[in-house]
Amino acid sequence: MSDTTIAVIIPAYRVEELILEAVRSVHAQTYTDWQIWVISDDATDYERVLGRQGLVDSRLHFLETGAIGAGASVARNLALDAIESRYVAILDADDRMKPGKLAAAHSALAEHPIVSSALDVMDTDYRRLRLVGAGPDRLLTPANYKFTSLSMDSMIVWDRTRCDARYDTSLTNMTDLELLMQLWRTAKTVHHLGEPLHDYLKRESSMSNGEGVTERMVRSKTTLLQRLSQGHYAFADPAATEGLASFLNISLAAEAAYPDALARMPGLLFEDHLEPMLRAHAAA
């Protein structure tokens, strides 16, 4: 297992145009000891797609799920089973890394098992909508992690010798948080990079923002709450359960109120809707 290489996992489902930006963002990293693992989940030959754009590199690896729409969790697990490097990073095919992300993550991984990053939330034209989790670098516990990183979590990097897991293929949403919950069985903290080093693209057709997302989110969050109540995760930090349950309960309340809030304020981001509720809880 390589002690320096960071393997970047990119599941690919109908992203022939968008994936170019994702792969180019890894190519532009100041830290060059990386691999990219593209997992086709739509029978597309992404090696050919990227090659047509001049993206040919021995550090690129390609796998296929053998299905159409098996899901990002299936694709990521396929890569996790194949990768031999110690460090793994997650990158959705419609997102990008800022050039210094892997260097900052690698430096932090010398002392910490998991690294997260502030997000630069963007529209489909790569215009900034807002930042999430920006500020100083800080050490987060499982109990308070989601009160800082209140949006998506598919920007983490982790050390597989200190914590590892596979994605839960039974969940439609919240799979990144659920993976973290597994990692927290042995990892007590997350080192959060306060500089927004990860571009998170908001697309209407994505699993996080598309039609029916509220219903899927509610089901997945409810499932995670049930697991917490049953002691499913046996966290290394005993305080994790209470903090995560608080976040999920607040998030479920936000889901219930979001349709009315969106009707009053068209275009309202869920993050902008949720954040004041989290702050009120933290201040109570």
Q: Model regions: which residues?
A:
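A conserved hydrophobic helix/loop-capping motif in glycosyltransferases and polysaccharide synthases
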Residues: 6-18, 22, 29, 39-41
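The conserved acidic donor/metal-binding loop of glycosyltransferases
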Residues: 92-96
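Glycine-rich, basic loop-to-helix element that forms the pyrophosphate-binding segment
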Residues: 65-83
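Short aromatic/hydrophobic "clamp" motif used to bind/position activated sugar donors
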Residues: 88
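Conserved donor NDP-sugar-binding/catalytic core segment of glycosyltransferases
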Residues: 100-129
